[in-house]
Amino acid sequence: AILRILKEEGCGVDCSSKVELTMAEACGFKGQEIMFSSNDTPEEEYIFARELGGIINLDDFSNIAEVEETLGTLPKTMSLRFNPGGYFKIANTIMDNPEEAKFGMTEAQILKEKGVEHFGIHAFLASNTVSNEYYPVLARQLFQLVVRIKKELGISLDFVNLSGGIGIPYRPEQEPNDILLIGQGVKEVFEEILVPNGLGHIRLCTELGRFMLAPYGALITKVIHFKETYRHYAGVDACAANLMRP
């Protein structure tokens, strides 16, 4: 029901498995409304994603050969997951520590040589940030990469997927994110970096499922077990199968 409402409101879907692709298909999502981001991916899932016309988002350099071998040829539109490397800091707090590999530049060149015509980049560096700075900082890094790809490779990207990461306040002392302020921050970076370089056409995508939905429902559970190790654990009669992203 929720997916159908999102479909009616013009949203797309982010899928990472055959089950999620199947749910997307059942709700009427198709083509570039679907972003397929997966790792350790079975061949049949690449095939299914292509059948639906979804955008396959590559997570690793080795995925290029895997997709080409599985599908026989690379799709005309593909996306690359970018990892900027180093420490990612927001408000003096380390949000994540991506590995050093800067996946994006070399891979874009290879895809171009193999016939891919439309490109996008994607990044997922942090989860459930309660900070208005995260998205604008991430956008700056991705937009700078977009400009480099255009200048050094002659490739003009079609879209940038900022992924998720904007969280909600689970604790009373936490301040909620200001989505209008976040949006304005991304807009300012867009106009500062992309527009002057002739890239104002680029489409921006987000994956804000938690931010959009989590505040409007509740999972009620009962504590059924306690465990004492180096921490105190309370086990409940629910699991990720009941609510994957609370």
How would you name each of these model-derived features?
Residues 1-159, 168, 189, 227:
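Active-site-proximal beta-alpha core segment in soluble small-molecule metabolic enzymes
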Residues 127-130, 134-246:
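C-terminal active-site-proximal or functional interface alpha/beta core segments in diverse enzymes
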